Amino acid sequence: MGDFGMSGDDLEQMYQEVILEAARDPHGREHFATDVSKEQGSAPADTTVRASHEYCTPGESHQFNPTCGDEATVHAEVSDSEPHTIERLVWDGHGCSISQASLSVMVDLCAGKTVDEAMELFRDFHELMESRGAGLQDEAKEEKLEDAVVFQGVSKYPMRIKC
């Protein structure tokens, strides 16, 4: 099952298509105003906010990979009422095609989901990235990951996982 029902060549072709699509039309990418975090009531842009979803507020996470220079800021807004839906999910940044494509796929996958659903997707994606190319061995999880499953190939290269 770890190949999402595809041959290695099919998965590689799908990977290339997802990367190229994200390069042409990166979903959720916005150029942030320098003070967007203050306007939205969240932490400064150079701060990573880490809070469990029980404290639903707008938040940002800024990440920098010093080994390759990838840099991204993700801004999320979550509804105050149950079931705490991700109402807005945008990002800005620069880096390699893998980092840019993964941000674009994340927006497609998580926007509009509940925080609990997004956290489940995060756990499944994290498991995929730790698989060293073997995949999840669970077709239902792979189907939920949609286009994100193409990053299975990246999991073969530990230095690229942070991308």
Language-model segment annotations:
Residues 13, 17, 66-70, 96, ...:
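Alpha-helix initiation and capping sites
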Residues 9, 62-63, 92-96, 108-111:
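Short, surface-exposed loop/turn motifs that are enriched in glycine and acidic residues
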Residues 1-52, 113-163:
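C-terminal binding/interaction regions
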Residues 55-56, 84-88, 106, 139-146:
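Glycine-rich, flexible loop segments associated with nucleotide phosphate handling
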Residues 74, 98-100, 117:
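Basic, gly/Ser/Thr/Pro-rich low-complexity segments located predominantly at protein N termini
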